[in-house]
Amino acid sequence: MAKKFGYTYRGFTTIVSDFRKRLKQYSAQDPFFQPRPKGRSKSVSAGEAREVVISLRKKYYSVEDIKVTLDSKGLPVSEKTIYTILKQEGFSRLPRRLKAAKTRLEPPQIQAAKSGMIALENEEFKSASAGIITLLPYIEHYGIRKSMEQSGYPETKTISKLNSILSFIALKASDISRYTTDDLWCMDRGAGLFAALNVLPKAAWFTSYSHRVTSKMNRDFLTRLHKIWKEEGLLGDTANLDFTTVPYWGEGDHLENNWSGKRGKALSSLLAVLAHDPDSGIIDYANANVKHSNESAVVLEFLDFYKDGNKKADTLKYLVFDSKFTNYENLNTLNKEGIKFLTIRRRGKNLVGRLNNVAANKWKTIRIEASGNKKRTLKALDEKVNLPGYEGEVRQVSITGNGKIKPAIIISNDTDLPVERIVRKYARRWLVEKAISEQIEFFHLNKVSSSMVIKVDFDLTMSIVTHNLYRLFARDMDRYAHRSDQRIYQEFIKNAADIKIQEEAIIIQLKKKRNLPLIIEKMQPFKDLEYPWLGNKKIHFEGATYS
């Protein structure tokens, strides 16, 4: 018989032996014709979730709210399954409720795990903020990870300096406005994976960590990043400098009053300086410890930072800033250092009156490129003038728009650059004002919870690092490089995903989104990149089958 049906003798006797055992074990059943069960087999997750679903429904949770809670408990059950369970248990549909009634729900008591290094075992989980993981390739590719490891920032017994910095960046990149509301992130596994942790630390840890940071640590870290930007060609020959006011809304008698353009008045605040590259959008330098007594010398401090002891570092050729940034004596110092400057001269009453009396034939009509591939017609007066405290003559370019606006007066020590390029170069300085405004809004620098300058300086440093990661990401997204950080977050970064940790790779299955195909395409060049802080695993980005 075994030979007839192609079995070996030993294999056939094993089949007979197993059949006899089943006859003894299931004597009441037909051994040949067994009924086939109808419908889908019940999943293990649905069985485990039944009690949770019933418990939450008794607290008037909707199907959507129950789904969110089950996901946080690691029970991947669909909304349809939840509805089926409720129907089987005899629950009717919830009555129509006002928004206020929905927000009065008793929150489920979920014990958040203690933050620690991720185990990186084979597992699957969901995350509501997994989109930030698309920034990790840029951290590794550009060598930013090494700068974090070599920085002087503190670490703890369980969380290294790399994991600590990545934890702050994870919150910044996720548009978290207040660190005190840790229930927004302390159970999200995807945000924890970004920092190679099981989950991000609680709010108390972030507060405690920032108390241990010094200004020297921030300066050292920015210096390391500065070298990366220079080596990668992300810093051109021009730097736009500007002050920004970081308001503090508590009691801060030790703080100075600084003018806030957005509020239209002076506020008790901290004054910070930023240096912005107009071409790449990279913010290269920041310092939140600027006082009224030394604000004029900030331009020289930035010059020292840029050269970092290397006087032959001649990449930087132009500094662009407004009229209140420094004084004429420091302009003279820049000129001696061989640095070209572009700035606005303050329009005194006598100066404006003299320009109004200049003959019309001395004004030159110029065409300046504007946004939207358009051009603007202006009139310019190019002349040489003397300034108090400045040795020699300086170039002065006065521009007006056919009498419709007051004259703007640009002064520079560059005598070779055409007038059109002088005006265009200064006009691009407004990009730094736009970048600062966006950064304050998106990274919530206008909501600082401490009046300690060092803590704000650290917060500003982390904001800059995250901003630069957004710029690197945006540069890769075709036709989206000009988007603000807020729009990049909304259109690309803000996304949930199913995450699978495997032996050699971590699979990120991002939910359907309009720009998802572009993200997956631009992540392909990084598919073979290994991440040392994630066990040298690779990260592969895919699209999920649902939105």
Give short role names for the model-derived ranges.
Residues 3-55, 89, 96-105, 130-147:
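Short, basic alpha-helical/linker "hinge" immediately adjacent to a nucleic-acid-recognition surface
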